[in-house]
Amino acid sequence: MNVPDQSIPVVVVGSIALDSIATPRGKREEVLGGSASYACAAASFFTSPGMVGIVGDDFPKGCKSLFDRLGINQAGLQVVEGKTFRWSGEYEENMDNRRTIRTDLNVFANFTPDLPEVYRGAPYILLGNINPDLQIHVLNQITRPKFVVADTMDLWIEVAPDALASMISRVDMLMLNESEARHYTGHHNL
């Protein structure tokens, strides 16, 4: 997609994946997944979001065409040689709880979210669930955002608590599910 000569209103940084999902209602293989994919799709109903992520050269053209049809600015989408990030999981009946069966980071393992210049003045930033050091790397590239939202998960709470605390101190809103909130705070009565 061509980059307009203006700032992007919303920048979303996160994963772009091919997911294989099992639910009590059925299974799907290699469907579009990832925090950046879904957040950009949702934001596209209101604005033209800027996507920051990485995919391999095996990323389906149909998925990229979907991003085009939704008006998602892809100046921050890196397409590199290798395989796209893949995740496989199973959801319980209530769809609140999931179990990861397999994670293949592939090209996502070497992802460094370097923002195009047109994204750096964005007033609204969503930092998807990625390593908090990478979230901080993004924050260091943005000039005076109005509002920053970050997502995290149990993995980062355990393996990167100092970086996570540093990142949290720089955002306006943190998204956690109930089990992550318990894990992070150490409180079981929320």
Model-derived features with residue positions:
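Short beta->alpha connector loops
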Residues: 56-57, 129-134, 153-157
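Active-site glycine-rich loop that binds ribose-phosphate moieties when present
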Residues: 105-114, 133, 155-163
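Active-site metal-binding loops of divalent metal-dependent hydrolases
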Residues: 14-16
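A short acidic, amphipathic alpha-helical/loop segment
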Residues: 63, 134-141, 162-166
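Histidine-anchored nucleotide/phosphate-binding helix
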Residues: 34-44, 139
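Structural detector of well-ordered beta-strand residues that form the stable sheet scaffold
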Residues: 11, 126, 148-149, 175
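Conserved N-terminal subdomain of the carbohydrate kinase-like
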Residues: 4-9, 18-30, 45-127, 140-145
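Conserved phosphate/ATP/ADP-binding segment of small-molecule kinases
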Residues: 143-147, 154-190
